[in-house]
Structures are given as structure tokens and as C-alpha cells.
Regions:
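Conserved C-terminal guanine-recognition region of P-loop GTPase G domains, centered on the G4
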Residues: 48-51, 75-123
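Conserved G1/Walker A P-loop phosphate-binding module
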Residues: 1-71
């Protein structure tokens, strides 16, 4: 069988735990902090799903919506709107926090509207 790599983008508001999820999935140790702006560029890591399938996990900067207000938010939008980007996701995982679930759902619905298969993770 041919090896396959699935691209999984971790997306969410700033400071909801995207990088913590990334570190758990990849075994890497990217810096985390209890304030926005820690991740300002996309980071990638690989995790093995089974004998022939790997997942390329893409940790993206925090954004509140797909209407960019900053350079790091623009990183998210440029990836999600460019199907020719080498990291265009097969699956988007929107990481949210239960305390601000309603605010986080705006981003979730915007990504769903792009017709990218999307999962919601409540951290």
C-alpha cells in the first residue's frame, strides 16, 4: 500500500490551547504561554496514525475570525483560502475553550462555510 499523509490544521482563537494539542499529538515541545501572540507563524509536526498513514499537524496562530486584523491572523487566512498551498488542510480542527464557546463558534462556522471537513475540540 502507498503511504499517505493527511494534513490537519489546528485553528482557534488566541490562547485556547492549540499549541498544547499540537505538542500532545506530535511529541514536540513548542512554547506555550497564557497570553495571546505566542504562535505567530505556522508550525508543523508529524504523527503516525497507523502503518501507512501519517498526519502532518499544522499549528496556526490564533485568530478570532477569517477577517484578518494582524499579520499572524493573515497566516491562517492565506492557508485556508489557497487550495494550492502545500499545507492546505484535509481536515480543520477548531480548538475552543468551554468558557468562551459562543465566541469561538464564529470561527468554526466560517471554516465550515469554506467546505473544509471540520472538527470542534473543546479544551
Amino acid at each position: 500500500m502507498t503511504p499517505k499523509t493527511i494534513k490537519v490544521a489546528l485553528i482557534g482563537n488566541p490562547n485556547v490551547g492549540k499549541t498544547s494539542v499540537f505538542n500532545q499529538l506530535t511529541g514536540l515541545n513548542q512554547q506555550v504561554g497564557n497570553y495571546p501572540g505566542i504562535t505567530v507563524d505556522k508550525k508543523t509536526g508529524i504523527t503516525k496514525l497507523n502503518q501507512i498513514t501519517k498526519a502532518k499537524i499544522i499549528d496556526l496562530p490564533g485568530t478570532y475570525s477569517l477577517n484578518a486584523n494582524s499579520i499572524d491572523e493573515n497566516v491562517v487566512i492565506e492557508l485556508l483560502l489557497n487550495k494550492n498551498d502545500e499545507d492546505f488542510p484535509d481536515v480543520a480542527v477548531v480548538v475552543t475553550e468551554v468558557e468562551n464557546l459562543k465566541r469561538n463558534l464564529l470561527l468554526f462556522t466560517q471554516i465550515k462555510d469554506l467546505e473544509i471537513p471540520t472538527l470542534l475540540v473543546i479544551n
